Amino acid sequence: MRHALITIASSFIGVLVALIAFYTWRDATQARIQAAAEAEQQARAERGRQLSENLLAEEREFQAIRNDVVAVSGARVAVVESYMNSGRMPASNAEAGLPAAETYKGHSLVSLTVAEGGAITLHFDAASGVDGGAIEWLPDLTGVESMGVQWECSTHDFKQIVRALAGCTYTPR
């Protein structure tokens, strides 16, 4: 009988140890799974935060470009007035009746230059997203009698220019 009691007691202790080991293993596994899920959630939140910051920075850059383009829109009017008065497109800021290129400053604009044929080039600093970036406005005189001077906007520097200026196109160099 004593032997049977020892066998039952040792079996009970063995089962108890096995249950404790199982629950300890299960809790450790669940803790690892929970930690991995929390780490993934934190990583997603960080990626989302970084994406939001990048989008906000891009939007600030585009807004700076938009504001500067609106602020200097009178330069296109001056070029057209010069053309209407003289019959030819101006080849410089002075011929268009505009101040020197470097006097044009804005949120990110550092200069505005009128070149041969009335082409207007806006140069930007790093606040635009591309230090030294440029946007060019080319006059189109093909329908000047019926529609007036039309302007074509293009850039080689701002890939997402259409987000800032809907009518502007990006062409890689």
Task: Identify the residue ranges that each predicted region occupies.
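N-terminal positive-inside, membrane-proximal cytosolic segments immediately preceding the first
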Residues: 1-6
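Small-side-chain structural scaffolding
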Residues: 14-17, 63, 78, 139
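Periplasmic/extracellular, small/polar-rich flexible segments of pilin-like filament-forming proteins
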Residues: 84-173
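Conserved hydrophobic/amphipathic alpha-helical signal-anchor segments
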Residues: 31-102
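Hydrophobic single-pass membrane-insertion segments
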Residues: 19-33
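Hydrophobic membrane-insertion alpha-helices, especially the h-region
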Residues: 7-22
